[in-house]
C-alpha cells in the first residue's frame, strides 16, 4: 500500500479505507508532520492553510511513547463559526489510522463553504444526503455510536447524519465523514 504523503488538499477525493484530503491511511507520523510544516502560515497562532482550504488552528495531542495521539484542526475563534472542528487525524502506533472531516454549518451558512469539499464516488460529501451513499454501498446504522457504516464492499467509511436511522429521518444530511484503516 502506498502511504506517501506530499500535500494536504481540501478538495481531494474521499477514498474509503485508503485516504482523505490526500492524506493516506498508514502514512507515518514523521512524514505527516513534515508535510504539515509546509502548510504552517502562523507559528504563534498555530494556523495552517491546506491547498484550497481555509485557515485552521491546530491542536496536537501527543504522540505518546507508543506513538498514539492526533491532530485537531478547527476554524479559529475569530471566525463566524467560532472554534468548529474541521479535520481530525488519529495516530496509532506512529501511523495514520483515521481521518475525519466535519461540516462547518450547512448552506446557507456562510461558513459552510469552508467545509472540506472532497467527494466519495465523485458525487457525495459533507452536506449531501446520507441516503446518497446508498447509490454505491450499503449503510448500516450503529445505534450505540449513532452513525452509519459503509458495507464491506466499499472500504471502511463512517458517516454521521442526525444520529437516527434513515427510516426515521430519510432527509438527513452528512455532518461528518471518517475513513478508517
Model-derived features with residue positions:
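Short helix/turn-capping signatures at newly exposed starts of structured segments
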Residues: 1-181
